[in-house]
């Protein structure tokens, strides 16, 4: 019988489980020697898009640059976007200048004159006369009513006459002729003239004198 060299209750080394070799353990350290720091850290700050302004100041700068570009054209429109954190603001803009390049090359008198077209029921004033708004209408009784806006005109400054040569009704003030209404019926007479609250109302009726003279 061989003696127990491990003492009482002992066990042989061959019965112990094999401990893992250090070479089999994963290397938790990175190249810098910090075991708790991963090699590649994610970039927590996303890149801001370069194609949109990053602040209101950048947007104002872009608008000023656009104004400089359209100085000769006189008009520009477009759209853009402002990024403010997680919010995005889309906008449209339109810029116009009141005077175009031709205003710098010539006087206002050199510009071509554009006359407004005549509309039915509204009589335009001849060139050189003060522009006022005049309307005419026919009543069921055959009367013709002329209504004119005369701001700043007093009753004693107004004179209404019939121009038989041109078959027109003339409105005159101390400044001259302010309106002329063509008449398609020359045989008319003024029956009533009223100026109330700077609104002139003239009533015209047709006369039968010419027809009566022809029948005799």
Swiss-Prot record:
Stored Pfam families: GvpH
Metal-binding listed as a keyword: no
Disordered: annotated segments: 1-141
InterPro entries linked to this entry: GvpH (IPR008633)
Any one cellular-component term (Gene Ontology): gas vesicle
Signal peptide limits: none
Assembly notes: GvpF to GvpM interact with each other in vitro, and may form multi-subunit complex(es). Interacts with GvpC. Might interact with GvpA.
Family listed: Belongs to the gas vesicle GvpH family.
Additional remark text: Encoded in a 14-gene locus called mc-vac.
Protein name: Gas vesicle protein H
Organism: Haloferax mediterranei (strain ATCC 33500 / DSM 1411 / JCM 8866 / NBRC 14739 / NCIMB 2177 / R-4) (Halobacterium mediterranei)
Upper taxonomic lineage: Archaea, Methanobacteriati, Methanobacteriota, Stenosarchaea group, Halobacteria
């Amino acid at each position: 019988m061989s003696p127990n060299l491990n003492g009482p209750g002992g066990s042989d080394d061959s019965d112990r489980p094999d401990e893992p070799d250090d070479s089999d353990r994963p290397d938790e350290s990175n190249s810098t020697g910090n075991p708790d720091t991963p090699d590649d850290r994610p970039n927590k700050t996303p890149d801001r898009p370069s194609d949109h302004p990053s602040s209101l100041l950048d947007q104002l700068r872009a608008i000023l640059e656009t104004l400089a570009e359209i100085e000769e054209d006189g008009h520009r429109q477009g759209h853009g976007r402002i990024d403010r954190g997680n919010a995005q603001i889309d906008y449209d803009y339109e810029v116009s200048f009141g005077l175009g390049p031709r205003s710098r090359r010539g006087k206002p008198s050199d510009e071509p004159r554009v006359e407004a077209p005549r509309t039915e029921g509204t009589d335009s004033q001849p060139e050189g006369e003060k522009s006022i708004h005049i309307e005419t209408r026919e009543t069921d009784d055959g009367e013709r009513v002329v209504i004119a806006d005369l701001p700043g005109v007093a009753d004693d400054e107004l004179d209404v006459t019939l121009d038989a040569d041109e078959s027109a009704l003339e409105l005159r003030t101390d400044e001259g002729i302010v309106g002329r209404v063509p008449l398609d019926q020359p045989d008319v007479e003024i029956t009533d003239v009223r100026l109330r609250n700077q609104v002139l109302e003239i009533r015209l009726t047709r006369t039968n004198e010419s027809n009566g003279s022809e029948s005799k």
